[in-house]
């Protein structure tokens, strides 16, 4: 496994060239999408206080609201001389902020299969358990230049936790745990993080039980279930809660 130092250095150099940086991610965000964008933004704001750094998207997450809200929209003309960084998004059709193309240059940072490459610079590592792990790696690689605080570290750790199945998935390795440990050393409150991640209302618990009872297993061992509008209405689910069904399977 390579450490991707060359592309990471190119990304840092590109960040240094711009006074305005806009960070976005995929729509219907999960913990990794929210954590990576907010965590990266936090690092850049601390490291380069003279720069304008925005996290701009067209949707939000109630489940992950404890990590903070979205930034207010900015005027379209401010994109023209901005660097846009897209996190955790394999293809451009899934980018939440549709104004991303107005930026002067585009960087893609992702850990999904690179089926449709895009961006002036692209750092894709399919072996990583989460995009947040890659952001932690980016910070640690340039630790002498990049600063972090407990707020940014909390966002990044949350994304690592949620995308790795609480560090249970096979994509987790020693590097994953070492990066998580570095975030812990910043001084984050893991008890607070896990308590917020476990705050589901009773309707969600009933839906989860229903999914486990009704899901099907294909001949190839793939678990699946259909979630339609009627089911969503029955359990009083938001679109975000309904789409989270994949995490139960």
What residue ranges belong to the model's regions?
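Short, motif-level signal for alpha-helix interfacial/capping segments enriched in acidic residues
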Residues: 3-10, 88, 140-143
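Glycine-rich, phosphate-binding/catalytic loops in enzymes
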Residues: 39-41, 101-104, 124-125, 178
């Amino acid at each position: 496994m390579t450490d991707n130092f060359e592309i990471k250095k190119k990304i840092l150099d590109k960040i240094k060239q711009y006074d305005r940086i806009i960070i976005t991610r995929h729509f219907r965000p999960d913990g990794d999408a929210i954590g990576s964008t907010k965590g990266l933004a936090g690092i850049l704001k601390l490291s380069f206080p003279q720069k304008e750094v925005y996290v701009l998207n067209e949707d939000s997450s109630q489940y992950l609201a404890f990590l903070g809200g979205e930034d207010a929209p900015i005027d379209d003309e401010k994109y023209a001389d901005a660097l846009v960084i897209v996190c955790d998004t394999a293809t451009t059709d899934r980018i939440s902020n549709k104004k991303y193309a107005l930026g002067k240059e585009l960087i893609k940072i992702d850990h999904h299969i690179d089926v449709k490459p895009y961006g002036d610079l692209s750092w894709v590592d399919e072996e990583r358990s989460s995009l947040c792990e890659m952001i932690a790696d980016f910070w640690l690689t340039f630790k002498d230049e990049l600063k972090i605080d407990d707020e940014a570290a909390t966002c990044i750790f949350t994304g690592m936790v949620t995308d790795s199945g609480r560090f249970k998935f096979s994509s987790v390795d020693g590097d994953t745990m070492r990066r998580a440990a570095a975030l812990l050393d910043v001084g984050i409150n893991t008890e607070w993080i896990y308590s917020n991640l476990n705050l589901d209302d009773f309707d969600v618990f009933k839906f989860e039980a229903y999914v486990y009872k009704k899901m099907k297993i294909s001949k190839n061992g793939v678990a699946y279930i259909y979630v339609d509008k009627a089911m969503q209405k029955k359990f009083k689910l938001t679109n975000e809660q309904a789409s989270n069904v994949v995490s139960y399977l």
